[in-house]
């Protein structure tokens, strides 16, 4: 029985399991790079990924002999220590979903098995002359080397995320006034992870509506009250402000009819429940801030110089219709005397969310424009978005109506690519053609390949001052 070959086969399985865990759990469902509480976990992941990268590539086609065998043993020892430390940190900072805990258990068992098999050959390896004996295993070696490259890239991503998380400009935002009770939906998302701490730091009481209330309470250190449905809130609850951020991630799965129904239900459906509670409330909230998106305005012809504002009309395409339906449901709160601020978000730039993924190709030296590069981008820094929320909060009843939460500058995608490359001191020479994006995403590709210039007309007219009005200033703060 060739125990060394069996160990490499188990390593290949480890690579597949690790890729699933990283993409599905760490990036998609748990979104670790967006969580300030995940900084230490991300740092551990970065070191572990670097070691795993060395192990996958180094063992793919070589046998480590002599002194190098002892180095290999030391690397495995460090890897085991980091894994155990990671388990402790995870349990201290977040509530792991069942699938992630099971995956980690399987990874630990499989990892122990391939390490044990490799150790069987350690006596002979340490006795051999120091060096690397070339012993390729065909496609298995190629696959292991590719796993090593992939996990190393993942480690770079985690290292940048861990380094960036501590200095969050959003922490400076304050929601002024006497202590109030605030209901926040979608609190565990990218924006909510910055909004809720800002509300708590400003002295307000926060109630979080979440499908997983125990997990939500855990994420905010027990400082919030978490409920699973509006039915858990009494009509006598006394909520002063409702901030509705709920909504399934719009960029991801193709927009099949089933997916469109999920997107509608997570926005309009949930909002309908909030409005129904407002109708029953003995004391009505003084304000409802309802998140929407600049997708309300649809898309502009590329090369258009027209700049849209809050009075511009919507379009008959799905992204616009989704926003219209969402806003229509939220606006029913006005029937019960509650002012509704419809906050149409541009693409939010922060140390979480979409920006890290957008910048990763540039960090690796493969960045460039997407499609023609002439599509306009309407965006906003996370600190300015929270500042705009605080601005609307202060206006109270005068905040009723639509607001564009976008920066004053609406660059083309080509200009964004050049700005990102300049801030990261990398080239911008590898364009992404439109056809594979359209093939992969279908109708959803319009989010990336099309755009519109949306001005924050009402924010500017009401005296709001942007901290990061240009892309270069925003990127300088975030990269």
Where are these regions (language model features)?
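C-terminal amphipathic/interface module of NAD(P)-dependent oxidoreductases
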Residues: 167-180, 446-479
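Mid/C-terminal beta-alpha module of Rossmann-like enzyme folds, strongest
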Residues: 171-181, 395-443, 476
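N-terminal Rossmann NAD(P)H-binding glycine-rich loop of SDR-like oxidoreductase domains
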Residues: 180-202
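NAD(P)H-binding glycine-rich loop region in Rossmannoid oxidoreductase-like domains
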Residues: 214-273
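Conserved Rossmann-fold NAD(P)-dependent oxidoreductase catalytic core, especially the SDR/UDP-sugar
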Residues: 260, 272-317
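Conserved beta-loop-beta element that borders a ligand/cofactor-binding pocket
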Residues: 292, 328-351
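Glycine-rich "substrate-gating" loop/helix at the edge of Rossmann-like oxidoreductase active sites
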Residues: 314-319, 344-352, 372-383
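Alpha-helical substrate-binding/gating segment
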Residues: 331, 359-367, 375-411
């Amino acid at each position: 029985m060739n125990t060394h070959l069996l160990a490499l086969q188990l390593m290949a399985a480890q690579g597949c399991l690790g890729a699933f865990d990283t993409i599905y759990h760490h990036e998609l469902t748990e979104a670790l790079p967006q969580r300030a509480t995940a900084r230490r976990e991300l740092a551990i992941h970065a070191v572990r990924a670097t070691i795993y990268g060395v192990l996958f590539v180094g063992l793919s086609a070589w046998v480590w002999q002599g002194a190098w065998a002892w180095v290999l043993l030391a690397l495995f020892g460090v890897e085991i220590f980091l894994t155990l430390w990671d388990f402790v940190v995870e349990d201290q900072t977040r509530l792991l979903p069942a699938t992630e805990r099971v995956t980690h258990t399987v990874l630990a068992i499989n990892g122990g098995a391939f390490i044990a098999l490799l150790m069987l050959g350690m006596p002979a390896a340490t006795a051999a002359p120091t060096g690397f004996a070339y012993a390729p295993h065909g496609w298995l070696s190629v696959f292991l080397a590719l796993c090593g490259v992939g996990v190393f890239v993942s480690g770079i991503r985690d290292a940048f995320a861990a380094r960036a998380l501590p200095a969050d400009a959003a922490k400076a935002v304050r929601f002024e006034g006497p202590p109030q009770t605030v209901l926040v939906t979608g609190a565990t998302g990218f924006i909510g992870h910055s909004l809720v701490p800002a509300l708590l730091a400003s002295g307000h009481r926060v109630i979080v509506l979440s499908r997983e209330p125990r997990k939500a309470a855990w994420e905010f250190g027990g400082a919030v009250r978490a409920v699973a449905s509006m039915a858990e809130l009494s009509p006598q609850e006394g909520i002063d402000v409702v901030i509705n951020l709920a909504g399934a991630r719009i960029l991801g799965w193709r927009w099949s009819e089933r997916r469109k129904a999920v997107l509608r239900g997570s926005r309009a459906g949930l909002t309908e429940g909030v409005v129904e509670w407002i109708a029953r409330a003995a004391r009505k909230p003084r304000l409802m801030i309802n998140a929407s998106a600049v997708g309300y305005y649809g898309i502009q012809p590329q090369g258009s110089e027209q700049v849209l504002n809050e009075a511009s009309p919507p379009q008959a395409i799905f992204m616009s219709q989704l926003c219209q339906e969402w806003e229509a449901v939220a606006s029913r709160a006005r029937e019960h005397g509650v002012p509704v601020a419809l906050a149409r978000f541009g693409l939010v730039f922060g140390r979480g969310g979409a920006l890290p993924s957008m910048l990763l190709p540039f960090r690796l030296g493969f960045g460039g424009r997407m499609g023609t590069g002439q599509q306009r981008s309407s965006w906003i820094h996370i600190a300015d978005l929270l500042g705009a929320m605080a601005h609307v909060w202060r206006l109270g009843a005068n905040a009723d109506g639509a607001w564009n939460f976008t920066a004053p500058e609406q660059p083309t995608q080509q200009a964004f690519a050049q700005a990102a490359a300049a801030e990261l001191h990398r080239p911008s020479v590898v364009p992404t053609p439109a056809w594979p994006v359209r093939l992969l995403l279908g109708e959803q590709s319009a989010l990336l390949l099309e755009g519109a210039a949306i001005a924050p007309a009402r924010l500017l007219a009401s005296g709001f001052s942007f901290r990061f009005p240009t892309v270069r200033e925003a990127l300088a703060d975030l990269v």
